[in-house]
Amino acid sequence: MLNFELLTTDGNARRGRVTLNHGVVETPIFMPVGTYGSVKAMSPLELNEIGAQIILGNTFHLWLRPGLDVVDTHAGLHKFIGWDKPILTDSGGFQVFSLGELRKITEEGVTFASPVNGDKLFLSPEISMQIQRTLNSDIVMQFDECTPYEIDGRPATHDEAARSMRMSLRWAKRSRDEFDHLANPNALFGIVQGGMFEDLRDESLAGLSELDFHGYAIGGLSVGEPKEDMMRVLEHVGPRLPAHKPHYLMGVGTPEDLVAGVAHGVDMFDCVMPTRNARNGWLFTRFGDVKIRNAAHRNDPRPLDEQCGCYTCRNFSRAYLHHLHRVGEILGARLNTIHNLYYYLELMREMRTAIEEHRFEAFRRQFAENRARGTR
């Protein structure tokens, strides 16, 4: 089940509400990434406390470990991981195609060597839909080929991007057919591909629109292309997605990327950046980024961000976070992750309010000014 309400707009920025089988998601929203069914360093209780409304799981990795038999004994991923709110799962395609020479692509699907034990495995649109049905994810993603930015060390050509995109379209039809055959009560999103070429993106979107997915994602960005190319494609595709369906930008990105995405009509985002950077001591604030390992923070009694309401900023100094990071304490990674995810979710809350009050462009200007100012 998916019901999408477009509550208001401000330019191309959209304020919406997505109702799914496990709850309601207010958009624009950021989805923390829980690759193996766990958002690294965070408990479900902590995710609830910072305002997470939906998380992302990884079909490919959960299929390999713990395996569908384990998840099935819990009647799905929600009970297995102790999370009662919505979950989106990707199709597994991106991970398979990231295996490089370890995989072989045919029209039927992808044969590859398991990165866990070397076993020969096969993944297709049908199998991806079956896995995601067992996981019982609220939002299922079609199986697609993520067109790489580079092939053999050079940008993909128009012909290469076209072949990849058209196979993804054929796989979209097979994904839709299998999703319907399984009588999956959840939602299925199609993924717009086409590389860096606007005409191919248009062809992809036209084909996907005929299949009437519950929502539409922009794939194949933040895969190594220059930032200006990413923004050019985003600016072209975002406003062209069906207005009455939710829009999802996959795997992107920085706080600046999120604000730009919302400006171009995106409703949903995911990225490992806030959690991965947190574990590496790279912290986001409204006034720029803090590299907590730097000696400048050794004796700094201030919080990361005096305007931040997260548990970390309310209770701990930069000096303490610096100390934890330098000695490799687990608590450091946890406190850093709490802060970074809170910052991302607070940024989305602020954008929702700005759109409701029809002052998104003013918010966008102030956001850029604050981030450029840097921490002091």
From Swiss-Prot:
Q: Which GO terms describe its biological process?
A: queuosine biosynthetic process; tRNA wobble guanine modification; tRNA-guanine transglycosylation
Pathway assigned to this chain's UniProt record: tRNA modification; tRNA-queuosine biosynthesis
For binding Zn(2+), which residues are annotated in this chain's numbering?
308, 310, 313, 339
For region RNA binding, the annotated ranges are: 251-257, 275-279
| Enzyme active site | 90, 270
Keyword flag Electron transport: no
Sorted UniProt keywords: Glycosyltransferase, Metal-binding, Queuosine biosynthesis, Transferase, tRNA processing, Zinc
Which GO molecular function entries does the Swiss-Prot or TrEMBL record give? metal ion binding; tRNA-guanosine(34) queuine transglycosylase activity
The reaction(s) catalysed by this protein are:
7-aminomethyl-7-carbaguanine + guanosine(34) in tRNA = 7-aminomethyl-7-carbaguanosine(34) in tRNA + guanine
Cellular component per GO, a single term: cytosol
- EC number(s) for this protein? 2.4.2.29
Keyword Transferase attached: yes
Q: Which Gene3D superfamilies match?
A: Queuine tRNA-ribosyltransferase-like
Q: Which cofactor does it need?
A: Zn(2+)
Q: Which domain of life is it from?
A: Bacteria
- Give the multimer and partner information: Homodimer. Within each dimer, one monomer is responsible for RNA recognition and catalysis, while the other monomer binds to the replacement base PreQ1.
Similarity remark? Belongs to the queuine tRNA-ribosyltransferase family.
- Kindly provide the name given to this protein in its UniProt entry: Queuine tRNA-ribosyltransferase
